[in-house]
Each structure stands twice: as C-alpha cells, then as structure tokens.
C-alpha cells in the first residue's frame, strides 16, 4: 500500500503520462545494430518463458506502441475490405444478384399486435389476448420478488 514501486511496472504521473522508454519502439527490429537480441539468454540459447514475460511486462510503452500499430493495421484492412470485397453483399451464396428489400412507405408509430409498455406498465391494449398473456407472464415472472405470508410453522411466536 505504500509508495514502494512494484517490480515489473513503470511509474506514472497523475496524468497517466508514461516515462520515456529506454528501449527502441516496436517498429524497430530487435536485431538492430547496438540493440539487444530478444529471445536469447546470456549463453545464446532461448530464454525461459518467465524471463520472456518479465521482459515484456517491464516495457509498457513498447507494448502500447505495438497495440496502436495493430489497431491501425486492423483499421486499414477493414477499409481495404470495403474497397475490394463489399460487392459480395449484393450477391447470394450461389452468385445470383440479390433483390433489394422494399421497405413500406408508412409505418404506424404504435403496434396493433404488441402492447406498448414503459416501466412495467402495459399500455392501452391490455384487453387483447396478447396483453392478457403478457400480464399473466409478468405475474409469474415477479412472483419470487413479492412479499408472501409465511407458512404457519414459520410464523414468529
């Protein structure tokens, strides 16, 4: 709880500004001249998985940069899909052109078949068979939350 730093986490200011990293950004290859060789231990062999994760956890800025690059690549690929493949939405799986769905000219604001309801108060169409069914379903749905009289053996003395 004190002000001791946690190992593996970078210190941040109150504005969530991360301190500058000493490592190269994610876009720079790790085998750049003068840069560390990632994935190799002191003897040149592969690092243990625990050491690999601790190395990743120590540099949040690099992970953040990598995440931003991945998001940008995803956005670009979505735009390319719209340019290259969006024509497929006009065809069915057999390759036939789909007919566009004709929307009605006028749609009434209130339904004739479904009762209007707001805040558990069913609207003006309660006398319809569907409205009566909904009231019955609502009655059984909230049954567990209702106060009930205790059975005789559970009554206080």
UniProtKB/Swiss-Prot annotation:
The keyword Ligase does not apply. Keywords: Cell projection. One of its GO terms (cellular component) is cilium. This is Ciliary microtubule inner protein 5. It is found in: Cell projection, Cilium. InterPro entries: C20orf85-like (IPR020339). It comes from the Eukaryota. Disulfide bonds: none annotated. The keyword Lyase does not apply. Residues 92-109 have a biased composition (Basic and acidic residues). Its main location: other. It comes from Bos taurus (Bovine). Residues 1-57, 92-124 are annotated as: Disordered.
């Amino acid at each position: 709880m004190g002000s001791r730093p946690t190992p593996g986490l970078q210190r941040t200011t109150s504005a969530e500004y991360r301190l500058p990293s000493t490592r190269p950004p994610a876009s720079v290859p790790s085998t750049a001249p003068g840069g560390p060789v990632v994935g190799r231990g002191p003897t040149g062999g592969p690092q243990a998985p625990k050491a690999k994760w601790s190395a990743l956890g120590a540099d949040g800025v690099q992970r953040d940069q990598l995440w931003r690059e991945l998001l940008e690549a995803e956005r670009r690929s979505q735009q390319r899909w719209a340019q290259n493949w969006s024509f497929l939405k006009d065809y069915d799986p057999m390759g036939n052109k789909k007919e566009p769905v004709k929307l009605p000219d006028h749609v009434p604001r209130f339904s004739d078949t479904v009762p209007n309801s707001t805040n558990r108060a069913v609207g003006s169409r309660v006398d319809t068979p569907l409205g009566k069914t909904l009231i019955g379903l609502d009655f059984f749905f909230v049954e567990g939350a209702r106060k009930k009289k205790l059975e005789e053996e559970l009554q206080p003395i």
